[in-house]
Each structure stands twice: as structure tokens, then as C-alpha cells.
A protein has these predicted regions:
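Extracellular-facing/secreted segment signature in eukaryotic proteins
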Residues: 2-153
């Protein structure tokens, strides 16, 4: 059985790790881009940075994630109609010969085509870059077709 001193020490370490993890996205910066908020996402060692404009219902985002394998791709999607993958509208990026390619696609099944296609809402300023740690960052601005401030991602 652990002594109370060992338990306090263990809880202190866990607390420090949680604080470090939750502050992680706040330490990230992007070339000449600033975002009002960020969150470390619970999977894929990824983070989402965003600024929401209530004036025109637009969302300016930076999504950072490592590809699952060398030469792989990353994607961030929102589902404007329900929870779940099917029906999602995705921003996808991959690196080809040192250049990041970013495109949009609709996820209409569990085996999506990953073809370039327009989304159900306007998206502009699509861009991407790689970080020194080999993560891929997707930049985009999108206009949300609904007026609520909560989205399913």
C-alpha cells in the first residue's frame, strides 16, 4: 500500500502532466496567424486553433496533426447534420514532393472516395504547411451555414 507521501507525489506528477498537456496548443504559433482559441484534441496528438466571427458566421482555423505514417495524410472534418463520420465535410492534407496539398471532400460512407469536391458550405483560404516535427497544419476559413456556435467534429 502506498504511503500518503507517495500518493501526494503521484498526484502532483499526474496534475503537472495534465496541466502541461492542456497548455500544449497555447504554446504553438503559426506564421503571421493568430487565433482566439485552441484546444488539444483527445486523439491523434492533434490540436485545433480557431477564431469565430459572429458577424458573418465564419470560422478561421488551423488544424495540426501528425500523419499516421510517413507519407500519410491528415484530415479535420465537421458534420453539419449529425454526430458521426458519415455526412462529414472534410479538409484533407498530404505532402507530395515536399509541397503540402490541401483539398476538401465529403465523407459519404465509411469507405470515402477521398476525391476533391466542394463542401456544403463555403471554404476559402485553404493552405497547408509542415512543421519541424513533421506535423501537417491545415489552414482554412469557412462559413458555417447554421447560426449555432457548436459543431460536431
Amino acid at each position: 500500500m502506498a504511503s500518503s507521501t507517495q500518493m501526494i507525489f503521484l498526484l502532483s506528477i499526474v496534475g503537472a502532466l495534465i496541466s502541461t498537456a492542456s497548455a500544449c496548443c497555447k504554446s504553438e504559433s503559426f506564421h503571421n496567424r493568430r487565433y482566439a482559441r485552441c484546444t488539444d484534441l483527445p486523439v491523434l496528438n492533434s490540436s485545433l486553433h480557431w477564431t469565430y466571427s459572429s458577424a458573418d458566421h465564419s470560422l478561421d482555423i488551423a488544424y495540426r496533426a501528425p500523419p499516421s505514417a510517413p507519407g500519410g495524410w491528415v484530415a479535420w472534418a465537421i458534420n453539419p447534420s449529425r454526430l458521426g463520420m458519415v455526412g462529414s465535410q472534410a479538409l484533407v492534407a498530404y505532402v507530395d514532393h515536399g509541397k503540402v496539398t490541401v483539398f476538401t471532400t465529403s465523407v459519404d460512407s465509411y469507405g470515402p472516395s477521398m476525391r476533391k469536391m466542394s463542401l456544403s458550405f463555403p471554404v476559402w483560404n485553404l493552405a497547408g504547411e509542415t512543421t519541424h516535427g513533421a506535423d501537417i497544419v491545415i489552414y482554412a476559413k469557412l462559413r458555417l451555414p447554421w447560426k449555432n456556435t457548436t459543431i460536431n467534429q
